[in-house]
Design a protein with these regions (language model features):
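Small-residue-enriched, tightly packed secondary-structure blocks
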Residues: 20-180
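Bacterial N-terminal signal peptides that target proteins for export
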Residues: 1-8
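C-terminal motif of bacterial Sec signal peptides marking the signal peptidase cleavage site
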Residues: 15-18
């Protein structure tokens, strides 16, 4: 029995570590999605000062949210430092409140300090206090200006979600591997 448990644990650890060891790939399709999202954010005049002040920013070109009272969201994005992609970020969100539907959005996080950027890159970065209200393609996402040195902006892209909820987001960072 003990040998069986040990074998099961070793098998589970091997399977999960294999998932982590996959290289992060930044290909042409992902580059185009990133450029499209960046162009959309750069076109918003109110974000100019954030682009000017940021030491880095993370762009999430396509995120999906769904909820029926309790909800969640998931998205994959890219961290840019000095205009260059340096890694991939995963976003997972949980929220609660009056919500029903599914929605697609894109978001950008601006890092105003090296300390905030380092915290993000260490992984398991959390962003709390988000409040949303949206219906179809018209929507607003309100977040505290900086948390304390991170600002987030969201563009609703589509879907139908009636929502008044509060939630927390967690981000995990994976450095970009050099291609061989």
């Amino acid at each position: 029995m003990n040998r069986w448990k040990t074998s099961l644990i070793i098998l589970m650890l091997s399977l999960t570590s294999a998932c982590v060891m996959q290289p992060v790939v930044y290909d042409e399709a992902r580059a185009q999605a990133l450029e499209s999202a960046l162009a959309s954010f750069r076109a918003r005049e109110e974000l100019t000062r954030f682009f000017d002040q940021a030491v880095a920013y993370a762009v999430f070109p396509a995120n999906w949210r769904a909820g029926t009272g309790f909800g969640g969201a998931f998205g994959t994005g890219w961290l840019l430092e000095g205009g260059e992609v340096t890694g991939r970020a995963l976003m997972v969100e949980a929220f609660v409140g009056a919500n029903l539907g599914i929605q697609g959005d894109r978001k950008i996080l601006f890092f105003r300090s090296e300390a905030a950027l380092d915290q993000f890159k260490r992984g398991r970065f959390e962003f709390t206090g988000q409040a949303n209200a949206s219906v179809a393609n018209v929507g607003k996402a309100i977040t505290p200006g900086y948390n304390p040195d991170v600002a987030m902006f969201v563009e609703v892209r589509g879907g139908l979600m009636v929502e008044a909820s509060v939630g927390t987001q967690r981000y995990d960072y994976f450095p970009l591997q050099e291609s061989e």
